[in-house]
Amino acid sequence: MPKAPDYSELSDSCTLAGGTARFSGPLHRAWRMMNFRQRMGWIGVGLYLLASAAAFYYVFEINETYNRLALEHIQQHPEEPREGTTWTHSLKARLLSLPFWLWTVIFLIPYLQMFLFLYSCTRADPKTVGYCIIPICLAIICNRHQAFVKASNQISRLQLIDT
């Protein structure tokens, strides 16, 4: 009768999947020392950067089209709004008149917030996850300021006894 394999010496899923062959090196050791949240954080950062590279390529291809449409919009003679003009056409015309750098800033702030959140998930201390997100950061700063004011008020109420 065949003997059941003994998996007691195999410590992680990589060695279980790979059989008896063990991967070695500093990257593998660092990966094994991370907990699940950190591993998923690094995978999320990698996928986010990969998707970002694809999106930036697409955006810069679109940039040429955007510039062409914006120039066509500017070169047209301003006409009186017609009754047949829909609100979507009017909105599109107004949005095309915004400069490209403004669109970049509008999309860059949430992009950086998401990246910093994913990066904070890679930290070893779970209490530090999300500290770099703007609303959380502002709440922490305000809370620290209130605690400082409260402590300084308590100190000023103490009467010093001169001996």
Curated annotation (Swiss-Prot):
What Gene Ontology cellular component terms go with this record? Golgi apparatus; Golgi cisterna; Golgi membrane
Q: Could you tell me the keywords of this UniProt record? A: Golgi apparatus, Membrane, Transmembrane, Transmembrane helix
Where does this protein chiefly localize?
Answer: Golgi
GO BP terms: namely: lysosomal transport; lysosome organization; regulation of vesicle-mediated transport
Where does the record say this protein resides? Golgi apparatus membrane
Q: Which ranges does the record mark as transmembrane?
A: 40-60, 100-119
Its membrane topology: Multi-pass membrane protein
Q: Which Pfam families match?
A: TMEM251
Source organism superkingdom: Eukaryota
- Which family is this protein grouped under? Belongs to the LYSET family.
Task: Share what the entry says about its subunit structure, partners included.
Answer: Interacts with GNPTAB; this interaction is important for proper localization of GNPTAB in Golgi stacks. Interacts with MBTPS1.
Q: What does this protein do?
A: Required for mannose-6-phosphate-dependent trafficking of lysosomal enzymes. LYSET bridges GlcNAc-1-phosphate transferase (GNPTAB), to the membrane-bound transcription factor site-1 protease (MBTPS1), thus allowing proteolytic activation of the GNPTAB. GNPTAB is involved in the regulation of M6P-dependent Golgi-to-lysosome trafficking of lysosomal enzymes. LYSET is thus an essential factor for maturation and delivery of lysosomal hydrolases.
**Name of this chain's protein:** Lysosomal enzyme trafficking factor
Q: Which organism is it from?
A: Rattus norvegicus
Q: Which gene encodes it?
A: Lyset
